[in-house]
Amino acid sequence: MILVAALYAVLAIGAHFLSLHLLFPRPPVSYEMGPDYFQLTTPDGVKLAARYWPNPEAKITFLYLQGNYEELGKLGEYIPTFVAAGYAVLAVDYRGYGHSGGTPTEANLYADAQLAYDHLRTKLGVPAERIVPFGYSLGSGPAVELALNQPVAGIILQGAFASAYRVETRIPLFPGDKFVNIRKMPRLRCPVMVIHGTEDRTVPFWHGKKLFLAATSRKTSLFVGGGPHGGLADYTGPHYWAELKRFTESL
């Protein structure tokens, strides 16, 4: 029995460090800090790279919280499509990503999302009732945490997971799971939109279904038949933007 307990402890510790490696792979930096970018400073003095895509006609501003293999340079390739669809967007590179200093952890991602939210409210003057956290993949974790603790118009989760460990296994075998969205969904009070492709090979479709079922506030879903994890908007086509508009206009 002692041997089994010791083996479990070793496996749990190994799972913890493996999860950190898998959660935060940090892609190569693909941009330079030019005039389109600026810095936010965390309470402990860490500089985070950020970018704001304005839209004077926008009624909704997305706080875009990206996946674990994205940074601002990559976002610059497709965020303009959100602006063209009528939205303003703010994004920030998590600590350790892009030109942001520091180290990514679950707690730090929550803090980074909060800092970006505060910038929207206090520096850009965007009222809470016009802010929608848009959490893609890993970004679903800080998006849900933010919406749980701050007033927002609604929340959009795309390619989101029930929890980080459950991306690899349906059964929570080890303690210390991270970004446990599934436990937080019933406590959200804002409107929720869940977007997921049925052929998502990175975060399986059942995650999106579970999150949607767990939400108790007003909710809508866009489950795309055959849809992948990345590039879902392009795969879906005009229907994606129509459903996004229908949700945001209801807020």
Language model regions located:
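Short alpha-helix in the alpha/beta-hydrolase fold that links the catalytic acid
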Residues: 78, 190, 204-213
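Alpha/beta-hydrolase
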Residues: 65, 94, 157-158, 224
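C-terminal catalytic histidine-bearing segment of alpha/beta-hydrolase fold enzymes
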Residues: 209-213, 217-251
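An N-terminal hydrophobic leader/cap segment in hydrolases
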Residues: 2-42, 51
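Membrane-embedded segments
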Residues: 47-119, 123, 129, 141
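Acidic catalytic loop of the alpha/beta-hydrolase fold
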Residues: 198-203, 229-231
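Short beta-strand/loop motif that positions the catalytic acidic residue
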Residues: 187-189, 194-196, 200
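Primarily recognizes the serine-hydrolase "nucleophile elbow" in alpha/beta-hydrolase
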Residues: 116-123, 128-173, 184-187
